[in-house]
Regions:
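Bacterial N-terminal signal peptides
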Residues: 1-3
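Bacterial signal peptide processing site
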Residues: 7-9
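N-terminal segments that cap or nucleate solenoid repeat domains
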Residues: 18-64
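Ankyrin-repeat boundary/"N-cap" motif
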Residues: 22-31, 54-60, 87-93, 120-128, ...
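Ankyrin repeat A-helix N-terminal signature
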Residues: 31-37, 64-70, 97-103, 131-137, ...
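Ankyrin repeat structural motif
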Residues: 37-45, 70-78, 103-111, 137-145, ...
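Leucine-rich solenoid repeat scaffolds
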Residues: 218-256
Length: 256
């Protein structure tokens, strides 16, 4: 029998402690993305770090994974709903960074997940094709063209990727672009052949002529590529042009 004045009490179950919220790692998520540290990225995301968080440069983790060519990190970020077409403070997208770096696998991954190769970036408003051409990334150029990138797209200065390749002295890139439909006679203004002739780029001159560039194409004031070669003292280029029927503007005007 229970003692007078005492009551039997049931033992109350202990309350479960709430699970501790995961803590973000000390390594910044942008650094983890650049190094391809997938586990660190996962820890950040589990701790609530936004997948598209930006740093002082306006860059997201995906920008950094694209820049360094870390495909696994890029894949994880994209699977976590990273926006593939965001621009950083310099107006650059992850696709441009991957294309410039020659990271074909990351370029393919971005394109497969909605990256837009038509978006223009930087001061010159260049599409992704230019980023690859400027760094002589032939495999990336071929991939972009195979996915529908316009080989004759123009930047803010009305120049094409072919103009850029000629300007940077990249004969193999000139050949690749010409093979894929680049307009070898240009679209107004200075022609690619004028540029190559005036700067003494023998191999590029020969490639352009082999791809049906007009030897006697004229621009402002009736100047031909031969005029520009002569004016800049490029005797070897002048000889090549003459071999293919090249004439000066004056000769064309006089009918000689």
């Amino acid at each position: 029998l229970a003692l007078l004045g005492c009551q039997a009490t049931a033992t109350e179950p202990a309350k479960a402690k709430p699970a501790a919220k995961p803590q973000a790692p000390s390594i910044p998520i942008h650094q983890a993305a650049y190094k391809g540290s997938a586990d660190v990225i996962r820890q950040h995301l589990a701790a609530g770090t936004p997948v598209d968080t930006t740093n002082q440069y306006g860059s997201t983790p995906l920008h950094y994974a694209a820049r360094s060519g870390k495909a696994d990190a890029a894949k994880l970020l994209i699977a976590s709903r990273a926006k593939v077409n965001l621009k950083d403070s310099k107006e650059i997208t992850p696709l441009h960074l991957a294309a410039s770096g020659g990271h074909t696998k990351v370029v393919a991954l971005l394109l497969a997940n909605g990256a837009d190769y038509k978006i223009t970036c930087g001061e010159r408003k260049e599409p992704a094709l230019f980023a690859a051409v400027n760094k002589n990334r032939a495999k990336v150029v071929a991939l972009l063209l195979s996915k529908g990138a316009d080989v004759n797209a123009k930047d803010a200065f009305a120049e094409t990727a072919l103009d850029s390749a000629v300007g940077k002295g990249l004969p193999e890139m000139v050949a690749l672009l010409a093979k894929n439909g680049a307009k070898v006679n240009g679209g107004g203004g200075t022609s690619p052949l004028h540029k190559a002739a005036s700067t003494g780029q023998k191999e590029i001159v020969e490639i352009l002529i082999a791809n049906k560039a007009k030897v006697n194409i004229t621009i402002a004031f009736g100047d031909t590529p031969l005029d520009w070669a002569n004016r800049n003292g490029k005797k070897d280029i002048a000889a090549i042009l003459k071999k293919h029927g090249g004439k000066t503007g004056e000769e064309l005007e006089s009918g000689n």
